[in-house]
Amino acid sequence: MSDSHLTAFDKASKAGFIIALGIVYGDIGTSPLYTMQSLVENQGGVNQVSESFILGSISLIIWTLTLITTIKYVLIALKADNHHEGGIFSLFTLVRKMSPWLIVPAMIGGATLLSDGALTPAVTVTSAIEGLKAVPGLSHIYQNQTNVIITTLVILIVLFGIQRFGTGFIGKIFGPVMFIWFSFLGVSGFFNMLGHLEIFKAINPYYALHLLFSPENHRGIFILGSIFLATTGAEALYSDLGHVGRGNIYVSWPFVKMCIVLSYCGQAAWILANKHSGIELNPFFASVPSQLRVYLVSLATLAAIIASQALISGSFTLVSEAMRLKIFPLFRVTYPGANLGQLYIPVINWILFAVTSCTVLAFRTSAHMEAAYGLAITITMLMTTILLKYYLIKKGTRPILAHLVMAFFALVEFIFFLASAIKFMHGGYAVVILALAIVFVMFIWHAGTRIVFKYVKSLNLNDYKEQIKQLRDDVCFDLYQTNVVYLSNRMQDHMIDRSILYSILDKRPKRAQVYWFVNVQVTDEPYTAKYKVDMMGTDYMVRVNLYLGFRMPQTVPRYLRTIVQDLMESGRLPKQEQEYTITPGRDVGDFRFVLIEERVSNARQLSNFERFIMQTKASIKHVTASPMRWFGLQYSEVTLEVVPLILSDILKLPIKELVPVEDSEA
């Protein structure tokens, strides 16, 4: 990796600063919309809070942002980049060779991040629209919560509906809008604080610890469930590392943290000034002059949409990485934008829309959604902590120090998890069920792949070179295709799946000029595109190992065209001149791709558990993208052959021949 690349990644710029605001901080930047509201409502309303409660709450928020977001994610996790990419799956690829069981926290963390994130659009957009209740002239309309729900659903329908067309055209305004948003948070919070400068005392962690054990705190330790709402977007700082670079996050985070802390302090000051007024509005909107509220609601809605868009795009990236790591079913992926980073997965898009819409309809108010929000993300953070410990050890940190540092963060996050566990009975169960469903699918997919690797028998290609050469030269068989390509998941040295050789020689002898055996391997580097060729001492058998990064599309025909051209130019592969063609000088023949689908056979080597895994995986495959689409073969000639899962040492089933008995009287 060149020094120039490292410098660009670690360097900050004005443009990068603005871009980071629009991509990275949508979730954590919209938390002021609902965090203080949740704290006040759970305490019994504005008239039930005291100065010590407010100071303690603000202190808890400040130190939660400092410990989890600043120290863990900004100062530690951002250094764990995988060739400039971040996120839990990127972190997993860095440490997966250290222990096979690390796939478990990676799957759990990915599933909980995906499931809890499905609530973000519902919470943020609903909170923003509820701000219309504080707008003179519109309050009488939006006091009816049904109108809030309808408006929220319309926004969500439009937001999810435009994903298929790409969002690059609106992405350009994300940064400037979020800059205005954060500036407003900071300025309004600062002016609200001027009359209550005692809020600055909240910097002292004493107030945070005192509140946890104070009788004034009606919820005890469970207050941390609401406090955690302030930092739910911390994981995004790490996940979006590759989009904006480490340097831009280092520079932009202090600005963002200052603005959101000022917003929380400003809301706290307004609460102290109005705790006897009986006002029951969201402190975020109520703390702003009434004549500015309509503009604030508009700005808050834009910020909520940007936060939701960041979540949706992040979900697509997360699922795409899981598919390439072979721990998630293959779904159709399209690229509506101008670059590979703008991808779209239709199935995931509409599942997210369904979950988000059902959340709005089921919970109705943002307050009820907040009661369920944040539970699963605490698990994601715990899983990231586990993987980070292994990363620190891998990078040379003394094991005892790595254990101590990560044990501290694990303890803090586990306390937040316990505090959020009460949310399970208030709607958190929906998020947990969704997370468990995703983990189940991941487990089935991963376990099914391991079972196939365990039982499928491989043969040495060298033992069949002569047979394949004889078939190639045997004019008794019609030419099946000039080039026949087999895609194999399992190809090591000269060993290859027996089903492939069975297809060439036994099922129907396939005569061709060149036989291609292609294996696609996903590398730890996100944007690798390399290949290795072994001609096996022939000019008619080609073994190709494609090494593609876990963020690269696996469009095999495009890569194969380049490889064929390279081999012909180097003289390793004879030119395949065409007698009939509309392309003058064409020297590459036609290609046919043969895909082999393995299905569960009735052989008795499979245990009941293994059979359940394989049958469940087969059922899931019915709703996933076909290998033809996944490998970019839609416009190629493709043959699909179905074979039973070939097992080693197949057991013979006993059977006897019935012999006719001669008539005794004959």
UniProtKB/Swiss-Prot annotation:
Places the protein is found: Cell membrane
Bilayer topology: Multi-pass membrane protein
GO molecular function terms attached to this record: potassium ion transmembrane transporter activity; symporter activity
Keywords: Cell membrane, Ion transport, Membrane, Potassium, Potassium transport, Symport, Transmembrane, Transmembrane helix, Transport
Reaction it catalyzes: K(+)(in) + H(+)(in) = K(+)(out) + H(+)(out)
Pfam (any one): K_trans
Source species, domain of life: Bacteria
InterPro entries: K+_transporter (IPR003855), K_trans_C (IPR053952), K_trans_N (IPR053951), Kup (IPR023051)
Main localization category: membrane
Membrane-spanning residues: 16-36, 58-78, 100-120, 149-169, 173-193, 221-241, 253-273, 294-314, 343-363, 373-393, 399-419, 424-444
Signal peptide segment: none
UniProt KW Mitochondrion keyword: no
GO cellular-component term (any): plasma membrane
Protein's job: Transport of potassium into the cell. Likely operates as a K(+):H(+) symporter.
Family membership: Belongs to the HAK/KUP transporter (TC 2.A.72) family.
PANTHER family: K+ POTASSIUM TRANSPORTER, OSMOTIC STRESS POTASSIUM TRANSPORTER
Protein name per Swiss-Prot or TrEMBL: Probable potassium transport system protein Kup
Name of the gene encoding the protein in the UniProt record: kup
